[in-house]
A protein has these predicted regions:
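Conserved AdoMet/S-adenosylmethionine-binding subsite of the radical SAM
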Residues: 2-12, 17, 21-139
């Protein structure tokens, strides 16, 4: 709490990775305590662990009660290129982004431009079009 004056009214803690959603039980408990102390909370995630299957989804819903903001890393909107970059398709990440929009949880979308890997004009246009469908993206 000694750093709270430094944070101001909007500052707080950000949990990043690895992938914080792989430690969801810990993050829930940490964020519960943070909220008790009046600390803003943020998760920096690639979203890959997201699923609406149990037991993950009920834990994720609980975590969202204590989360003020998510930084969602969309590495590539094109599923095939996303799989080439990461080894996984992006369907669960897209599903997570849509769910966060449904519950109106504030999100910052992040995308790293890597020449010849994630900077294709058609994919950037598609990413922009997708972001336009979300009601919760904080610009």
């Amino acid at each position: 709490m000694r750093f709270k004056p430094y944070w101001g009214k909007d500052g707080g803690i950000t949990i990043s990775g690895g992938e914080p959603l792989l430690q969801i039980d810990f993050v829930i408990e940490l964020f519960k305590k943070a909220k008790e102390l009046g600390i803003n909370t943020c998760i920096d995630t690639a979203g890959n662990p997201f699923t609406k299957e149990e037991p993950f989804f009920s834990k994720f819903e609980e975590l969202m009660k204590y989360t003020d903001l998510l930084l969602l890393d969309l590495k590539e909107i094109n599923p095939a290129r996303h799989k080439d970059l990461t080894g996984f398709d992006n369907s669960n990440i897209i599903e997570m982004a849509k769910y966060l929009s449904e519950i109106n949880k504030p999100v910052w979308i992040r995308h790293v431009l890597v020449p010849e890997h994630s900077d294709f004009d058609e994919d950037l246009d598609a990413l922009g079009d997708f972001i336009d469908t979300l009601s919760n993206v904080d610009l």
